[in-house]
Amino acid sequence: MADSTETNADTLRRELQKVLTEILNDGGGNDRDETEAFSGVVKAIDEAVRILTCLRKVESKIPESDISPVEVPKEFICTLSNTIMIEPVIIASGQTYEKRYITEWLKHERTCPKTKQVLSHRLWIPNHLISDLITQWCLVNKYDHQKPSDELVAELFTSDIEALLQRVSSSSSVADQIEAAKELRHQTKKFPNVRVFFVAGIHDSITRLLSPLSTLDEAVDSSLELQENIVTALFNLSILESNKTVIAENCLVIPLLTKSLKQGTDETRRNAAATLSSLSAIDSNKIIIGNSEAVKALIDLIEEGDLLATKEATSTVFNLCIVLENKGKVVSAGLIHAATKKIKAGSNVDELLSLLALISTHNRAVEEMDKLGFIYDLFSILRKPSSLLTGENAVVIVFNMYDRNRDRSRLKVVGEEENQHGTFTKLAKQGSVRAARKAQGILQWIKRFVTGKEPQRA
């Protein structure tokens, strides 16, 4: 009796499989009009419900010990997760996927995972039909219908990372290393889960990623593309807050980034500086970078680099100078000469003025600006500042240059600028709150100088 019942159940499952296929595929390329197609789908749905009802009755007669594991209909399985769908949704291509998986996919892609079709939009709608059929099927078959965990969703996007890293770190072919590094660069850029998994989930991952570069000598011309992709992947990984300390404390990272600041493609040098800028957001990393040869390489990049490279290097040095002891190090490395040279040439003026305003509280920095005659460049900027912030930073530098030494002969230079152009009076009226405050302070010094009184510290 049990055998006969099981045979009936198998027959019903096969019938259900055929009906499900008809429901899901109906209208996919045939010539029937919409009314006829809709009528066919409705009939198929009714038939599926009838079969499921019969199947439930049949299954209830089978002793639990005789029930063999059931095979989930492939129409109920999400092709992204390879598991039965919990919340099926339809995307623009007409395909149905598990909501949590396709939502993660659509954050980074605009193609259908199955058809590779470019989607007209990234919206999805619930597939209530399939959801109801899955629910009934699970009840009939006593199938556990659990919600997928976040870890399983993450696993979808990290399953091939270990293999890619293995190819980068141990491949005998440079071409294969480049291909794998390029894919790692792509995945670490597009998928936040990959950034988490790469550092936290793979043992010694940073060392393995950088190993091809650590074996290179000073001449890296033969592997410029490999270097660029590895450095850029490292930058992508450094964006994640929890990765910054782990990356910076790896003994290979700072030396290899320093090397990449000096040599490589323009993009490699920019991204090496961007990585250091990202890492330097953490206070402990400011110390690590400040104690390395990266400081001199960053200053050289400020002087020699293109617009974007100089911007990234300046951002890094700015972060480093938040730590007091690093100010003297960047001055010793030649920052003042490099920065003033770029400003005189009209390049990266806003970023570099912000940096010099920060470091103008350091005595040696002010002395070097004085020797280079930078005060006259500041006057020129203050007469026609490109923005409120530019004017603010320029007047802060002027204030700090003269606040430490209000010698009359020095103040005479500032007084002449005010007499000829009214520079500080304009700033006091039209500048930002901070700029106006500094300009007022300078005007008070000038007034005291004109009256012959020794300027007093505020």
Swiss-Prot record:
GO MF term list: ubiquitin-protein transferase activity
Domain of life, source organism: Eukaryota
Domain U-box: 71-144
Top enzyme class: transferase
Known EC number: 2.3.2.27
Gene Ontology biological-process entries: cellular response to water deprivation; protein ubiquitination
Keyword Repeat set for record: yes
UniProt-listed Gene3D superfamilies: Leucine-rich Repeat Variant, Zinc/RING finger domain, C3HC4 (zinc finger)
Keyword Hydrolase: no
ARM repeats: 241-281, 283-322
Catalyzed chemical reaction(s): S-ubiquitinyl-[E2 ubiquitin-conjugating enzyme]-L-cysteine + [acceptor protein]-L-lysine = [E2 ubiquitin-conjugating enzyme]-L-cysteine + N(6)-ubiquitinyl-[acceptor protein]-L-lysine
Pfam families: U-box
PROSITE patterns linked to this entry: U_BOX
Keywords assigned: Repeat, Transferase, Ubl conjugation pathway
Pathway(s) per entry: Protein modification; protein ubiquitination
Role of this protein: Functions as an E3 ubiquitin ligase.
PANTHER family: U BOX DOMAIN-CONTAINING, U-BOX DOMAIN-CONTAINING PROTEIN 46-RELATED
Name of the protein: Putative U-box domain-containing protein 46
Species of provenance: Arabidopsis thaliana
Upper lineage: Eukaryota, Viridiplantae, Streptophyta, Embryophyta, Tracheophyta
